[in-house]
Amino acid sequence: MATAPTPREEFVYMAKLAEQAERYEEMVEFMEKVTAAVESEELTVEERNLLSVAYKNVIGARRASWRIISSIEQKEESRGNDEHVSVIRDYRSKIETELSNICNGILKLLDSRLIPSAALGDSKVFYLKMKGDYHRYLAEFKSGAERKDAAESTLTAYKSAQDIANTELPPTHPIRLGLALNFSVFYYEILNSPDRACGLAKQAFDEAIAELDTLGEESYKDSTLIMQLLRDNLTLWTSDMQDDGADEIKEAAPKGNDEPQ
Protein backbone atom coordinates (compact mmCIF):
# COMPACT_ATOMS: atom_id res chain seq x y z
CA MET A 1 0.00 0.00 0.00
CA ALA A 2 1.37 3.36 -1.08
CA THR A 3 2.26 5.88 1.58
CA ALA A 4 -0.12 8.83 1.73
CA PRO A 5 1.48 12.00 0.36
CA THR A 6 2.48 14.66 2.85
CA PRO A 7 0.71 18.05 2.73
CA ARG A 8 3.93 19.46 1.24
CA GLU A 9 3.85 16.90 -1.59
CA GLU A 10 0.16 17.57 -2.22
CA PHE A 11 0.74 21.33 -2.47
CA VAL A 12 3.63 20.78 -4.91
CA TYR A 13 1.40 18.56 -7.06
CA MET A 14 -1.41 21.13 -6.99
CA ALA A 15 1.07 23.85 -7.98
CA LYS A 16 2.09 21.75 -10.99
CA LEU A 17 -1.57 21.27 -11.93
CA ALA A 18 -2.18 25.01 -11.63
CA GLU A 19 0.84 25.66 -13.86
CA GLN A 20 -0.49 23.29 -16.52
CA ALA A 21 -3.86 25.05 -16.33
CA GLU A 22 -2.09 28.44 -16.48
CA ARG A 23 -3.80 29.48 -13.23
CA TYR A 24 -0.75 31.25 -11.86
CA GLU A 25 -2.39 33.11 -8.96
CA GLU A 26 -3.43 29.73 -7.55
CA MET A 27 0.02 28.36 -8.30
CA VAL A 28 1.45 31.14 -6.11
CA GLU A 29 -0.98 30.22 -3.32
CA PHE A 30 0.01 26.54 -3.42
CA MET A 31 3.73 27.35 -3.39
CA GLU A 32 3.27 29.73 -0.47
CA LYS A 33 1.63 26.81 1.36
CA VAL A 34 4.68 24.67 0.50
CA THR A 35 6.93 27.36 1.97
CA ALA A 36 4.83 27.47 5.15
CA ALA A 37 4.86 23.66 5.40
CA VAL A 38 8.67 23.35 5.32
CA GLU A 39 9.14 25.75 8.27
CA SER A 40 12.88 26.49 8.55
CA GLU A 41 13.85 23.78 6.05
CA GLU A 42 15.12 24.77 2.62
CA LEU A 43 12.99 24.34 -0.50
CA THR A 44 14.14 21.75 -3.03
CA VAL A 45 15.40 22.94 -6.43
CA GLU A 46 12.10 21.86 -7.98
CA GLU A 47 10.09 23.73 -5.34
CA ARG A 48 12.03 26.97 -5.64
CA ASN A 49 11.71 26.80 -9.44
CA LEU A 50 7.94 26.33 -9.15
CA LEU A 51 7.71 29.31 -6.78
CA SER A 52 9.75 31.43 -9.18
CA VAL A 53 7.67 30.41 -12.20
CA ALA A 54 4.43 31.15 -10.36
CA TYR A 55 5.43 34.65 -9.29
CA LYS A 56 7.13 35.48 -12.59
CA ASN A 57 3.95 34.70 -14.53
CA VAL A 58 1.71 36.61 -12.12
CA ILE A 59 3.97 39.67 -12.23
CA GLY A 60 4.73 39.27 -15.94
CA ALA A 61 1.09 39.69 -16.97
CA ARG A 62 0.83 42.95 -15.00
CA ARG A 63 4.16 44.28 -16.27
CA ALA A 64 2.97 43.71 -19.83
CA SER A 65 -0.35 45.44 -19.07
CA TRP A 66 1.45 48.40 -17.51
CA ARG A 67 3.69 48.85 -20.55
CA ILE A 68 0.73 48.77 -22.94
CA ILE A 69 -1.32 51.25 -20.87
CA SER A 70 1.69 53.58 -20.44
CA SER A 71 2.26 53.57 -24.19
CA ILE A 72 -1.39 54.44 -24.85
CA GLU A 73 -1.20 57.18 -22.21
CA GLN A 74 1.77 58.78 -23.98
CA LYS A 75 -0.04 58.71 -27.33
CA GLU A 76 -3.19 60.27 -25.87
CA GLU A 77 -1.10 62.94 -24.10
CA SER A 78 0.60 63.86 -27.37
CA ARG A 79 -2.83 64.22 -28.99
CA GLY A 80 -4.08 66.43 -26.16
CA ASN A 81 -6.92 64.08 -25.20
CA ASP A 82 -7.05 65.15 -21.55
CA GLU A 83 -10.25 63.23 -20.71
CA HIS A 84 -8.77 59.99 -21.99
CA VAL A 85 -5.48 60.65 -20.21
CA SER A 86 -7.29 61.04 -16.88
CA VAL A 87 -9.11 57.72 -17.32
CA ILE A 88 -5.93 55.96 -18.41
CA ARG A 89 -3.99 57.27 -15.40
CA ASP A 90 -6.62 55.90 -13.02
CA TYR A 91 -6.43 52.53 -14.77
CA ARG A 92 -2.63 52.56 -14.70
CA SER A 93 -2.76 53.32 -10.98
CA LYS A 94 -4.90 50.21 -10.45
CA ILE A 95 -2.33 48.06 -12.26
CA GLU A 96 0.48 49.65 -10.24
CA THR A 97 -1.30 48.75 -6.99
CA GLU A 98 -1.47 45.12 -8.15
CA LEU A 99 2.21 45.21 -9.11
CA SER A 100 3.17 46.64 -5.72
CA ASN A 101 1.17 44.01 -3.83
CA ILE A 102 2.70 41.12 -5.79
CA CYS A 103 6.25 42.43 -5.40
CA ASN A 104 5.80 43.16 -1.70
CA GLY A 105 4.37 39.68 -1.17
CA ILE A 106 7.34 37.79 -2.60
CA LEU A 107 9.87 40.23 -1.09
CA LYS A 108 8.40 39.61 2.36
CA LEU A 109 8.62 35.84 1.80
CA LEU A 110 12.22 36.13 0.61
CA ASP A 111 13.32 38.23 3.59
CA SER A 112 11.44 36.30 6.27
CA ARG A 113 11.84 32.69 5.09
CA LEU A 114 13.70 31.91 1.90
CA ILE A 115 16.95 33.88 2.19
CA PRO A 116 17.53 33.08 5.91
CA SER A 117 17.06 29.33 5.28
CA ALA A 118 19.33 29.22 2.19
CA ALA A 119 22.45 27.21 3.02
CA LEU A 120 24.07 26.47 -0.34
CA GLY A 121 25.71 28.98 -2.67
CA ASP A 122 23.31 28.40 -5.56
CA SER A 123 20.28 28.83 -3.25
CA LYS A 124 21.61 32.09 -1.82
CA VAL A 125 22.32 33.49 -5.28
CA PHE A 126 18.94 32.29 -6.58
CA TYR A 127 16.97 34.05 -3.82
CA LEU A 128 19.09 37.22 -3.73
CA LYS A 129 18.75 37.49 -7.51
CA MET A 130 15.00 37.04 -7.09
CA LYS A 131 14.99 39.79 -4.45
CA GLY A 132 16.81 42.08 -6.87
CA ASP A 133 14.39 41.21 -9.67
CA TYR A 134 11.27 42.19 -7.69
CA HIS A 135 12.78 45.42 -6.40
CA ARG A 136 13.66 46.14 -10.06
CA TYR A 137 10.06 45.54 -11.10
CA LEU A 138 9.02 48.13 -8.49
CA ALA A 139 11.60 50.57 -9.84
CA GLU A 140 10.11 50.19 -13.34
CA PHE A 141 6.95 52.09 -12.43
CA LYS A 142 7.67 53.98 -9.20
CA SER A 143 8.80 57.62 -9.26
CA GLY A 144 10.71 60.03 -7.05
CA ALA A 145 11.95 58.76 -3.69
CA GLU A 146 10.14 55.42 -4.08
CA ARG A 147 11.94 54.73 -7.34
CA LYS A 148 15.27 55.68 -5.79
CA ASP A 149 14.67 53.34 -2.84
CA ALA A 150 13.64 50.47 -5.13
CA ALA A 151 16.71 50.99 -7.33
CA GLU A 152 19.04 51.05 -4.30
CA SER A 153 17.45 47.86 -2.94
CA THR A 154 17.86 46.22 -6.35
CA LEU A 155 21.52 47.16 -6.51
CA THR A 156 22.18 45.89 -2.98
CA ALA A 157 20.51 42.53 -3.64
CA TYR A 158 22.21 41.99 -7.01
CA LYS A 159 25.62 42.93 -5.59
CA SER A 160 25.18 40.53 -2.66
CA ALA A 161 24.20 37.78 -5.10
CA GLN A 162 27.14 38.64 -7.36
CA ASP A 163 29.65 38.44 -4.48
CA ILE A 164 28.50 34.91 -3.63
CA ALA A 165 28.19 33.82 -7.27
CA ASN A 166 31.72 34.96 -8.12
CA THR A 167 33.23 32.92 -5.28
CA GLU A 168 30.95 29.86 -5.13
CA LEU A 169 29.58 29.28 -8.64
CA PRO A 170 31.52 28.67 -11.88
CA PRO A 171 31.18 31.29 -14.68
CA THR A 172 29.12 28.81 -16.70
CA HIS A 173 26.55 28.16 -13.94
CA PRO A 174 23.08 29.10 -15.27
CA ILE A 175 22.11 30.91 -12.06
CA ARG A 176 25.30 33.02 -12.15
CA LEU A 177 24.71 33.77 -15.84
CA GLY A 178 21.04 34.62 -15.19
CA LEU A 179 22.11 37.03 -12.47
CA ALA A 180 24.56 38.75 -14.83
CA LEU A 181 21.83 38.99 -17.46
CA ASN A 182 19.30 40.65 -15.15
CA PHE A 183 21.90 42.82 -13.38
CA SER A 184 23.02 44.20 -16.75
CA VAL A 185 19.38 44.90 -17.73
CA PHE A 186 19.03 46.82 -14.44
CA TYR A 187 22.06 48.99 -15.29
CA TYR A 188 20.69 49.67 -18.77
CA GLU A 189 16.99 50.21 -18.07
CA ILE A 190 16.80 51.55 -14.51
CA LEU A 191 20.15 53.30 -13.95
CA ASN A 192 20.51 54.42 -17.60
CA SER A 193 24.10 53.24 -17.57
CA PRO A 194 24.71 51.47 -20.91
CA ASP A 195 28.49 51.32 -20.42
CA ARG A 196 28.14 49.42 -17.13
CA ALA A 197 25.44 47.20 -18.63
CA CYS A 198 27.63 46.27 -21.58
CA GLY A 199 30.70 45.79 -19.38
CA LEU A 200 28.91 43.42 -17.02
CA ALA A 201 27.24 41.43 -19.81
CA LYS A 202 30.47 41.15 -21.82
CA GLN A 203 32.52 40.03 -18.81
CA ALA A 204 29.97 37.34 -17.91
CA PHE A 205 29.82 36.14 -21.52
CA ASP A 206 33.62 36.09 -21.98
CA GLU A 207 34.24 34.28 -18.68
CA ALA A 208 31.66 31.64 -19.57
CA ILE A 209 33.09 31.18 -23.08
CA ALA A 210 36.54 30.59 -21.59
CA GLU A 211 35.21 27.69 -19.52
CA LEU A 212 32.65 26.32 -21.95
CA ASP A 213 34.58 23.06 -22.40
CA THR A 214 34.11 22.28 -18.68
CA LEU A 215 30.33 22.56 -18.93
CA GLY A 216 28.43 19.39 -18.09
CA GLU A 217 25.69 18.06 -20.33
CA GLU A 218 23.08 18.72 -17.63
CA SER A 219 23.32 22.52 -17.73
CA TYR A 220 24.79 22.99 -21.23
CA LYS A 221 21.45 23.94 -22.81
CA ASP A 222 20.47 26.35 -20.01
CA SER A 223 23.85 28.06 -19.86
CA THR A 224 24.29 28.49 -23.62
CA LEU A 225 20.75 29.84 -23.88
CA ILE A 226 21.47 32.60 -21.35
CA MET A 227 24.81 33.30 -23.03
CA GLN A 228 22.89 33.86 -26.26
CA LEU A 229 20.58 36.31 -24.46
CA LEU A 230 23.62 38.16 -23.08
CA ARG A 231 25.05 38.39 -26.59
CA ASP A 232 21.70 39.54 -28.02
CA ASN A 233 21.54 42.37 -25.48
CA LEU A 234 25.14 43.37 -26.15
CA THR A 235 24.39 43.56 -29.86
CA LEU A 236 21.25 45.60 -29.20
CA TRP A 237 22.94 48.00 -26.77
CA THR A 238 26.17 48.55 -28.69
CA SER A 239 24.57 48.88 -32.14
CA ASP A 240 22.66 51.97 -31.07
CA MET A 241 22.62 53.17 -27.46
CA GLN A 242 19.87 55.65 -28.35
CA ASP A 243 17.61 53.09 -30.03
CA ASP A 244 14.11 52.69 -28.61
CA GLY A 245 14.39 48.92 -28.70
CA ALA A 246 14.19 48.52 -24.92
CA ASP A 247 11.16 46.23 -25.29
CA GLU A 248 13.40 43.70 -27.02
CA ILE A 249 15.86 43.55 -24.13
CA LYS A 250 16.22 40.00 -22.87
CA GLU A 251 16.22 39.12 -19.20
CA ALA A 252 16.40 35.85 -17.37
CA ALA A 253 13.00 34.23 -17.27
CA PRO A 254 11.19 32.49 -14.45
CA LYS A 255 12.79 29.12 -13.90
CA GLY A 256 15.88 28.60 -11.82
CA ASN A 257 17.65 27.52 -14.99
CA ASP A 258 16.58 30.82 -16.57
CA GLU A 259 14.88 29.31 -19.58
CA PRO A 260 12.73 31.90 -21.35
CA GLN A 261 9.01 31.30 -21.45
Swiss-Prot record:
- InterPro entries, per this entry? 14-3-3 (IPR000308), 14-3-3_CS (IPR023409), 14-3-3_dom_sf (IPR036815), 14-3-3_domain (IPR023410)
Q: Spell out the disulfide connections.
A: none
Q: Which domain of life is it from?
A: Eukaryota
Q: Which PANTHER family does the record associate with it? A: 14-3-3 PROTEIN
In which family does this protein belong, per the annotation? Answer: Belongs to the 14-3-3 family.
From the Swiss-Prot or TrEMBL record, give the protein name: 14-3-3-like protein A
Q: Which organism is it from?
A: Vicia faba
